[in-house]
Amino acid sequence: RFDSIAMKENIALSMADVLTFNSSVFVKNYGRATLSTVAFRGTSPSHTQVTWNGMRINNPMLGMTDFSTIPSYFIDDASLLHGTSSVNETGGGLGGLVKLSTAPANHKGFGLQYVQGIGSFSTFDEFLRLTYGDKHWQSSTRVVYSSSPNDYKYRNRDKKENIYDEDKNIIGSYYPTERNRSGAYKDMHVLQEIYYNTGEGDRFGLNAWYI
């Protein structure tokens, strides 16, 4: 089970980054806003089951989960179950289980939280949470929005430029430095949760997650 402090300290990261820094599982990450998969030792990503509030969220076609699309800001509790220890939770997890869950707001009245992160290449991450709670009802709305032109400079070694003298003779060559023009991305996630406590020990919940 992940330490709650570690989860709070990494709210600006995806769950792929949280697993990389705080667990022994193998995370294959192709960069920001690209595919990130998780595999337990000796197995493939399709052997890793992922649940959110008890519901399996593996891709039904590929059998794996892209953890870059899961903001850690949306997760209140996370734990890992290795190998056959995951059978009690869900079947089909030969490698193991990544168990994710959210929790209702534990305070009464309205609450508002806003966090912004700024990175290189004009990268912006914005996090917003609006909560409300009373004796019977709890509501939570979380929004994550990330954007970046991702226009870093690189040396294009597929494009060689020649250097000419006054007589148009080639006297040298070089690889030009260009700026990436096709790496821009915008990513938005919305999580809406509504809970109702009957006051008799039962609680009903309705959760909706837009990826």
Predicted regions and their residues:
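Short acidic/polar hinge/loop motifs at secondary-structure boundaries
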Residues: 55-82
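Short beta-strands and strand-coil junctions in structured, solvent-facing domains, enriched
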Residues: 47, 57-58, 84-88, 148
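Short strand-turn segments of transmembrane beta-barrel domains in outer membranes
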Residues: 77-79, 87, 97, 102-132, ...
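Periplasmic-side early beta-strands and strand-to-turn transitions of outer-membrane beta-barrels
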Residues: 107, 132-211
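Extracytoplasmic beta-strand/coil segments of soluble accessory domains associated
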Residues: 16-59
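A short, compositionally biased micro-patch
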Residues: 20, 33, 41-43, 73, ...
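N-terminal periplasmic "start-of-domain" segments of outer-membrane beta-barrel proteins
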Residues: 1-8, 37, 45-48, 78
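Transmembrane beta-barrel architecture of outer-membrane proteins
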Residues: 10, 14, 35, 65, ...
